[in-house]
Swiss-Prot record:
Pathway: Metabolic intermediate biosynthesis; 1-deoxy-D-xylulose 5-phosphate biosynthesis; 1-deoxy-D-xylulose 5-phosphate from D-glyceraldehyde 3-phosphate and pyruvate: step 1/1. Mg(2+) binds at D152, N181. This is 1-deoxy-D-xylulose-5-phosphate synthase. PROSITE patterns: TRANSKETOLASE_1, TRANSKETOLASE_2. NCBIfam families: dxs (TIGR00204), PRK05444.2-2 (NF003933). GO terms for cellular component: cytosol. One of its GO terms (biological process) is 1-deoxy-D-xylulose 5-phosphate biosynthetic process. InterPro entries: Dxylulose-5-P_synthase (IPR005477), THDP-binding (IPR029061), Transketo_C/PFOR_II (IPR009014), Transketolase-like_Pyr-bd (IPR005475), Transketolase_BS (IPR020826), Transketolase_C (IPR033248), Transketolase_CS (IPR049557).
Amino acid sequence: MSFDIAKYPTLALVDSTQELRLLPKESLPKLSDELRRYLLDSVSRSSGHFASGLGTVELTVALHYVYNTPFDQLIWDVGHQAYPHKILTGRRDKIGTIRQKGGLHPFPWRGESEFDVLSVGHSSTSISAGIGIAVAAEKENKQRRTVCVIGDGAITAGMAFEAMNHAGDIKPDMLVILNDNEMSISENVGALNNHLAQLLSGKLYSTLREGGKKVFSGVPPIKELLKRTEEHIKGMVVPGTLFEELGFNYIGPVDGHDVLGLVTTLKNMRDLKGPQFLHIMTKKGRGYEPAEKDPITFHAVPKFDPTSGCLPKSSGGMPSYSKIFGDWLCETAAKDNKLMAVTPAMREGSGMVEFSKKYPDQYFDVAIAEQHAVTFAAGLAIGGYKPIVAIYSTFLQRAYDQVIHDVAIQKLPVLFAIDRAGIVGADGQTHQGAFDLSFLRCVPDMVVMTPSDENECRQMLFTGYHYQDGPSAVRYPRGNAVGVELEPLTKMPIGKGIVKRHGEKLAILNFGTLMPEAAKVAESMNATLVDMRFVKPLDETLILEMASRHEVLITLEENAIMGGAGSGVNEVLMANRKPIPVLNLGLPDRFIPQGTQDEARAEIGLDAAGIEAKIRTWLA
């Protein structure tokens, strides 16, 4: 979309953060209003993360107004809320390309802009990185300031508290801003708190505070008494005791939509020494009533008409794999009250909304705490229940030690329902489910299943749920199922594949939902097609049979080639002295950027045309 100067006259004056800092302070509310309207106009035309950015407009304006970015370093946690930041840092005219192939990255990205200090996508990393950045600046004697912005969801993760505990110990000069948009920590927002925040962050209070520390440093009982008195007084009116105990100077909560008040408070805090903590209260979806009322639905949106206030409805095609899982979950829970479903803040994405309403006593959303989710499930299994951990492939990476140490070593029957496996599309490098087959198949006693369609997905979930000799995993992609008939649920024989088509010289061993593409190639090349189903244990008998009957083998998977299912096939062949040529096809050894799933598969040659072209080139 072209930028309409007439609609956004103040925003038009801001082509850089230097120009922003030249504006009179009184113009910042108008700038914030225009920035919010421009964000609404842009995202509604192009799609993208929406509600979070609407809630951080004033904060973003205030931060770039007060701090000398990019010299001063601003770190956004996760990055859903960073669209206003991108608009103000030279990417305004490209914001309509966000999450598209060749367009702006969906999150802050170091390779995209010097203003993006940390590449992000997963949550709760900002404070840890910020401490390292602040320490590096101090060691280089650079007078740059470090600011981390983290949400009230992300701050619940253990990593964030580990970082704050460390900051309290080494006391770097840095500011952590808690963007609290769920009222989950405090509701004490109002004129008194805003005034108190400005008072507590002001020079007079800070001077008296530091002066008192020096005067009474040699009199420990008095120093301790003053410290406890200060904590008591602040604790009566602010909810920051926890952060104070971690070693931060806590200020807040303040109104995160009062841009002038934020500027005053940030200026006061800018030169304070040691770890500082500013708690701001915002409203997700601010300024657009439908998003304010339903921020979850408007978290990430397709193209829509903002005047209607409604998102486009589903076209009514095939159900998503997430829905297939959710329906199976409800169906199983209706027959077994021992089922316990666990998810780390992925209720909507994992298709668990209906289940959470129907079976609230069997549903646990542990927040952004993947490590805890897995070990919590281990405890449920020890207690005689049947836990299912519903988690995205990319987030399971964060709990790998728990999968091994707390589940697999003890051979606990935990079922992992791994959503968003393979190419996910618009969220790019940080969210592709590229590695789960590689890091799971090397874990002893783990059963790993890759369905080729929704019927197999249900059968595998059923099989894993009833498997009691250790952990199991079923991985399935983002997107819609293929439309096959759903059969009655039965347990599948563990580690057995099936031949779908008999051919001549070539055999394609397919793992997972690339099966429709593999079928087209098999038909075109008169190849044998095998639905391998299991990555672990592999069907070694079937692999050796295919090797004996064919001249070459092709393995196909939507996982990293290195260490993936194809590598397992190679190992079987070598162990059995079957020196047959094998071509492993899958995700290449690089991080795959944003774009649609179809665009990504076409680019890396995992659509039917690309698969056939790679095979023919290899055979030539």
